[in-house]
């Protein structure tokens, strides 16, 4: 099995490559990155099964050439609102199986529709194999399976506990932070009252989490909100929520959004501020409460044995100290 790891020496890609390398059936991993020297240097940490190379994914001819020589492409190249859809299209055209960690709802919608492309029947494409989406979907699914009838499905996480990677090939603005900026401005798509709706992100939602009680979280644009009703159209509501336990964090994020929408700062400047803010948070930062929502969770409301109940599923253990790459 030969694998092309796009963005393979980036903050997320490094963890994917290390994990794939441990599988004996993997014959070759091509670590492809716009930063060729970083890809080659990272690949040198492994044996000859891993090779680093430079690749500009916006060069479609070069991308097709590389994909046509492998069995699987693993896409960890962000921001996904810019790159996910065209890369999957190329995978379909070259008959190459596709996996990604796409965390934007807009391309997720478009990529799900590609299932209707007759050419796609020859490949397997799995979207959102990260922490969120990915792990959150599994946690929410476990919660759903505890119910006889499911009405609401929420995925959620603590945005203030996500720490960026120390090692990455990326220079300039952090792609994950650009993603975050895009999903907190304007409007995002959610599923409410059995239909898709565009709503204002960061709107406060109350969630009565089992054994914890009523807590506040905020709507954040993400694939889970649109992918659950795609697969389970019988549900009434699907949201992705984020919370920030550090005192004043959500207020700070809303203020940054205001500056963007007043055109006082650019999206790239906002992304740089968010990157600095996440790196500045420490375990000593004052918390809002000693009892908070889990760092990552899946939540469902519905009916069990004729009674209205809520189910929450999280990871056994604290994941607050994990970086985004480790969690992914």
Set out the residue ranges of the language-model regions:
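N-terminal Rossmann NAD(P)H-binding glycine-rich loop of SDR-like oxidoreductase domains
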Residues: 4-19
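Short beta-strand element of Class I
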Residues: 28-30
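Helix N-cap at the beta1-alpha1 junction of Rossmann-like dinucleotide-binding domains, i.e.
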Residues: 35-37
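Conserved Rossmann-fold cofactor-binding substructure of NAD(P)-dependent oxidoreductases
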Residues: 55-69, 76-79
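ADP-ribose/adenylate-binding Rossmann-like module
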Residues: 79, 90-108
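Rossmann-fold NAD(P)-binding glycine/threonine-rich loop
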Residues: 102-123
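C-terminal catalytic/substrate-binding lobe primarily of soluble NAD(P)-dependent oxidoreductases
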Residues: 145-328
């Amino acid at each position: 099995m030969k694998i092309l790891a796009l963005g393979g020496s980036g903050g997320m890609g490094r963890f994917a490559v290390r994990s794939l390398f441990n599988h004996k059936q993997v014959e070759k991993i091509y670590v492809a990155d716009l930063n060729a020297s970083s890809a080659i240097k990272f690949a040198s940490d492994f044996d000859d099964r891993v090779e680093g190379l430079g690749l500009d994914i916006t060069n479609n001819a070069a991308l097709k050439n590389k994909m046509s020589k492998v069995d699987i492409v693993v896409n960890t190249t962000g921001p996904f609102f810019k790159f996910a859809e065209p890369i999957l299209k190329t995978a379909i055209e070259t008959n190459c199986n596709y996996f990604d960690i796409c965390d934007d709802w807009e391309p997720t919608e478009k990529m799900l529709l590609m299932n209707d492309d007759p050419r796609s029947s020859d490949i397997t494409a799995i979207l959102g194999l990260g922490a969120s989406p990915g792990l959150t979907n599994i946690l929410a699914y476990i919660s759903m399976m505890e119910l006889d009838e499911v009405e609401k499905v929420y995925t959620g996480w603590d945005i203030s506990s996500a720490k960026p990677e120390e090692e990455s090939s990326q220079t300039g603005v952090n792609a994950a932070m650009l993603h975050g900026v895009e999903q907190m401005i304007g409007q995002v798509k959610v599923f409410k009252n059995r239909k898709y709706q565009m709503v204002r992100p960061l709107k406060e939602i109350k969630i009565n989490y089992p054994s914890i009680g009523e807590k506040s979280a905020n709507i954040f644009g993400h694939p889970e909100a649109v992918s659950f009703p795609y697969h389970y159209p019988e549900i009434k509501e699907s949201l992705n929520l984020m919370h920030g336990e550090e005192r004043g964090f959500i207020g700070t994020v809303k203020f940054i959004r205001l500056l963007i929408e007043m055109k006082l700062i650019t999206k790239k400047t906002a992304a740089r501020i968010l990157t600095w803010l996440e790196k500045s948070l420490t375990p000593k930062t004052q918390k809002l409460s000693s009892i908070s929502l889990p760092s990552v969770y899946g939540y469902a409301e519905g009916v069990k044995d004729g009674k209205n109940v809520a189910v929450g599923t999280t990871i056994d253990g604290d994941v607050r100290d994990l970086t985004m790459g480790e969690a992914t």
